[in-house]
From Swiss-Prot:
The keyword Oxidoreductase does not apply. The gene is glgA1. InterPro entries: Glyco_trans_1, GS/SS, Starch_synth_cat_dom. This is Glycogen synthase 1. Synthesizes alpha-1,4-glucan chains using ADP-glucose.
Length: 462
C-alpha cells in the first residue's frame, strides 16, 4: 500500500482504490506486517490470533487505521515480515527463499478474517485479492468450504509466484490440488493460478490487457484458462486511475507551479531538472522516464536509441530501480554522456513529479503494459507520452493528440515514435495544442470505483 510501502504500481493502486470505494461500502485493507508498515502505524490493536498449521507459523492480526481513518488490518509475524530489503526480496534483490510460506501465511489469515474468524466484530461480504501474493485467498476459502465471493485482480500476469511441488505440503494445501485444473503449472506450484482457478471473478487493470492475456503472446502459458474465464464472462478489464493530487498547479515539490498554457512555468521546471542532473543548458527536448527498470519496460530500447536521441538534440532523465544490469547500463550511459543523460536510481515521489513537470516527453516503450500509470501522470504535467500500442498505453494515449503510439516493441518502431515527437517539438503550435489536450484529460479513480462497486454488488448480491 502506497501510504507505507511501494513496489511498482500495485502499492499506488491498493492505496487509492479503497479510498475511492469508501462512499460505496465498508472497505478494509489487510497487509503483511512489513517493517515499514509497523513503524508508521500507531495504536495497533490485536484482534485475533492464527495458530500454526503445516509449515505456517502462528501469528497475530492487528487492527489500526491510516491517517485519514481507513481501517487497516496487519498480519503480525516478525519472523516472516520484519526484514530489510523490499517486501519480496533481500537488499541484494534476491527473492526470500521462504516466500511461499510468507504469502501463504498471509493468504490463509486473510481468508480467516473474511470468514469472520479473526475479528469477532467484522466479517466480509466479499474479498478482493491482488496479484500472486494474495492469490491463495480464494483457494483457502474453497478448501475450507466458504461460499464467500472473491475477486482476483491481475496487475501483471508475468509474475506468477512459482514454487517447487513440495510447497503444496508446506502451505497446507490438499494434495488433490496439484493437477492441471488446480495449482500445477509445468510441475511447479503456481500461486497465481490458484486465484485464476478459484476466484469468483477475475479483473485486470485495462480492457485491452484483459483481451491480450487470452492470447499466446501475452498469456504466459495461462491463456487457455483465461479464455475459459473470459468466455464465461468472468474476466473484466477495469482501467486504473491516478492520484489527482499530482497536479502541476499545486505541487509544492516543483520549482514553479504551472497550468495548461503556462509554458514559462514548465520551462522553469525543465531548467531545474537540468541543473539537478548536471545536464547542459539546452533548447532541445527533454525525454523523461519514471519506471521500474526492468526488461518489460523496454529500458534496453531506450539505451539502444540514446545516442540517436542525443545527436538529434535531445536529453534523457531517468528515475527508477529494478534489474541491476539495467541500472548499471543506465549509469554507464550517464558516464559516457553526462551532459545529456541524467540517472537517479531509486524511486522518490518528489523527483518523479519534477521529471514529469520538466520533461517534454515521457518514454514508455514497454513490451507489454497491463495498465501503466506514468503515461497518465505525464499527460497531467504536459509531458507527452511515447508508448508502445499495448495494454493500458493503447487506452490512455490518443495518438497524435495527447501523445504518440508506435506499433511494435522494436528499435526502429520506437525510434519512429521518437522522431514524431521531435517533429512536434519543432512545430510550436502542434506542441502547445497537444500539451493542452493531454493536461485536460481526466483519469479519476471515481470512474474505476464505479465499475468495481457495480461488480462487488453483483457478486455479493447486495
Amino acid at each position: 500500500m502506497d501510504d507505507f510501502v511501494r513496489v511498482g504500481g500495485l502499492g499506488a493502486v491498493s492505496a487509492a482504490l479503497p479510498r475511492a470505494l469508501r462512499p460505496f461500502a465498508d472497505i478494509r485493507i489487510m497487509l503483511p506486517g512489513y517493517r515499514d508498515i509497523i513503524e508508521q502505524l500507531t495504536h495497533i490493536q490485536i484482534v485475533g490470533r492464527c495458530p500454526s498449521f503445516a509449515d505456517l507459523p502462528a501469528c497475530s492480526l492487528g487492527r489500526a487505521a491510516t491517517k485519514d481513518g481507513l481501517p487497516v488490518y496487519v498480519l503480525l509475524c516478525s519472523q516472516l515480515y520484519d526484514r530489510p530489503g523490499n517486501p519480496y526480496g533481500d537488499e541484494s534483490g534476491r527473492d526470500w527463499p521462504d516466500n511461499d510460506i510468507r504469502f501463504a501465511r498471509f493468504a490463509s489469515a486473510a481468508a480467516e478474517l473474511a470468514m469472520g474468524k479473526l475479528d469477532k466484530n467484522w466479517a466480509a461480504d466479499l474479498i478482493h485479492a491482488n496479484d500472486w501474493q494474495a492469490s491463495l485467498v480464494p483457494a483457502y476459502l474453497a478448501w475450507r468450504g466458504a461460499k464467500l465471493p472473491s475477486i482476483l485482480t491481475i496487475h501483471n500476469l508475468a509474475y506468477q509466484g512459482l514454487f517447487p511441488k513440495d510447497s503444496l505440503r508446506r502451505i497446507g494445501a490438499p494434495e488433490s490440488a496439484f493437477h492441471i485444473d488446480g495449482l500445477e503449472f509445468y510441475d511447479q506450484v503456481s500461486f497465481l493460478k490458484a486465484g485464476l482457478v478459484y476466484a469468483s471473478h477475475l479483473t485486470t487493470v485495462s480492457g485491452t490487457y484483459a483481451r491480450e492475456i487470452t492470447t499466446a503472446e501475452f498469456g504466459c502459458g495461462l491463456e487457455g484458462l483465461l479464455r475459459l474465464r473470459s468466455d464465461a464472462a468472468e474476466l473484466t478489464g477495469i482501467l486504473n486511475g491516478i492520484d489527482e493530487s499530482w497536479d502541476p498547479r499545486s505541487c509544492a515539490q516543483l520549482a514553479q507551479q504551472f497550468g495548461a498554457g503556462d509554458w514559462v512555468g514548465k520551462k522553469a521546471n525543465a531548467d531545474y531538472v537540468r541543473k539537478q542532473f548536471g545536464l547542459a543548458v539546452s533548447r532541445g527536448p527533454m525525454f523523461g522516464i519514471v519506471a521500474r527498470l526492468v526488461h518489460q519496460k523496454g529500458i534496453d530500447l531506450v539505451l539502444s536509441a540514446a545516442d540517436e536521441i542525443i545527436d538529434a538534440g535531445g536529453q534523457i532523465v531517468v528515475t527508477g530501480s529494478g534489474e541491476p544490469a539495467l541500472e548499471q547500463a543506465l549509469i554507464d550511459a550517464h558516464r559516457r554522456r553526462p551532459d545529456a543523460i541524467g540517472v537517479a536510481i531509486g524511486f522518490n515521489d518528489a523527483q518523479a513529479r519534477r521529471i514529469f513537470a520538466g520533461s517534454d516527453f515521457t518514454l514508455m516503450p514497454s513490451r507489454f503494459e497491463p495498465c501503466g500509470l506514468s503515461q497518465m501522470y505525464a499527460q497531467r504535467f504536459g509531458s507527452l507520452p511515447i508508448g508502445h500500442q499495448t495494454g493500458g498505453l493503447a487506452e490512455t494515449i490518443t495518438d497524435g493528440e495527447t501523445g504518440f503510439l508506435f506499433s511494435r516493441p522494436s528499435h526502429e518502431s520506437f525510434l519512429g515514435g521518437v522522431r514524431r515527437a521531435f517533429e512536434a517539438f519543432m512545430a510550436q503550435d502542434q506542441l502547445d495544442s497537444m500539451r493542452r489536450s493531454a493536461m485536460g484529460r481526466s483519469f479519476s479513480w471515481s470512474i474505476s470505483a464505479d465499475s468495481y462497486s457495480a461488480l462487488y454488488r453483483k457478486l455479493a448480491a447486495v
